[in-house]
Amino acid sequence: MHVQDRHGRPVMSLRLSITGRCNVNCIYCHRDGMTSSRGELSAADIEKLCRVASDLGVGKIRLSGGEPLIRDDIVEIVERINNIGFRDISITTNGTLLEGYSAALSEAGLDRVNVSFDTLNPETYRFITRKDYLERVKSGITSAVDVGLDPVKINMVILRGVNHHEVWDMFEFCREKGAVLQIIELLKTESCHDDAVERYHCDITPIEAELAEMADRIRTRKFMQDRKKYYIDGGEIEVVRPMDNTRFCANCTRLRVTPDGKLKPCLLRNDNLVDTRDALRENDTGRLRELFFEAIRRRSPYYTP
């Protein structure tokens, strides 16, 4: 049984940002390749939070960052979470370290992976990330598919004047690899600064109209913010459109955790966080449950009709 917030939305998944560190420096992210691990939750503390979440009916865990594979204990973290008994464990990664970890992560209990990968063009990749890791990422995607992580999804943020013309090339790449393409509208968040949104935000309505015209079948995923999935010639494309999207909020089922242990009721807000660090230090499970309920109580749609 899922706990519901005061708007009737069930809390079904927990997304833990387990590090703010990253080994790339993307043009739309203001974290600037952060390198400090200060304040990050330990693997044991991550397990404590996940156990409380499981007791409250959460069935899905996603690990993200920063770049989660930077953590030396990432396999241990997945093992600890898997031992709790969640039905789905996933990771969002930039893919640069994935080839070396995919087999161990799969064995530890990881079910699936999302790879942030915005372009197949080496020069464009270097422009976006300020690194030359494109071939590493492609090898990581191949490795993830080969070890049986399923699905492997490619997160492609559409950037005006940068990669907006590459959607079909990326679709062909994904179809060939057996991966699912997710095209994502650039969203203003704590990690994406205003200048980047103003400079690179691209209205993806024309792309979605083209997908609708070409699709053999279209599916609407209610508990994934009513996002559309388009099936085209044996391939799949999902469209993620959070900007000013009331359905994105109305069907949100996710609670988030920051790298330093704050429960985050809303992706787009930082003024209503719930700090769990004292309860974690004191190993106070009862207090952690209370804090989860408080975070759920604070959940409110950011975009409203």
UniProtKB/Swiss-Prot annotation:
Broad enzyme group: lyase
Keywords: 4Fe-4S, GTP-binding, Iron, Iron-sulfur, Lyase, Metal-binding, Molybdenum cofactor biosynthesis, Nucleotide-binding, S-adenosyl-L-methionine
Gene: moaA
Cofactor: [4Fe-4S] cluster
MF terms in GO: 4 iron, 4 sulfur cluster binding; cyclic pyranopterin monophosphate synthase activity; GTP 3',8'-cyclase activity; GTP binding; metal ion binding; S-adenosyl-L-methionine binding
Gene Ontology BP terms: Mo-molybdopterin cofactor biosynthetic process
Pathway this chain belongs to: Cofactor biosynthesis; molybdopterin biosynthesis
EC number: 4.1.99.22
Details of cofactor binding: Binds 2 [4Fe-4S] clusters. Binds 1 [4Fe-4S] cluster coordinated with 3 cysteines and an exchangeable S-adenosyl-L-methionine and 1 [4Fe-4S] cluster coordinated with 3 cysteines and the GTP-derived substrate.
HAMAP family documented for this protein: MoaA_A
Swiss-Prot/TrEMBL catalytic activity: GTP + AH2 + S-adenosyl-L-methionine = (8S)-3',8-cyclo-7,8-dihydroguanosine 5'-triphosphate + 5'-deoxyadenosine + L-methionine + A + H(+)
Similarity field: Belongs to the radical SAM superfamily. MoaA family.
Pfam families the record matches: Fer4_12, Mob_synth_C, Radical_SAM
Protein name per its UniProtKB record: Probable GTP 3',8-cyclase
Role according to the record: Catalyzes the cyclization of GTP to (8S)-3',8-cyclo-7,8-dihydroguanosine 5'-triphosphate.
Positions of the Radical SAM core domain: 6-233
Binding site for GTP: 15, 62, 92, 153, 254-256
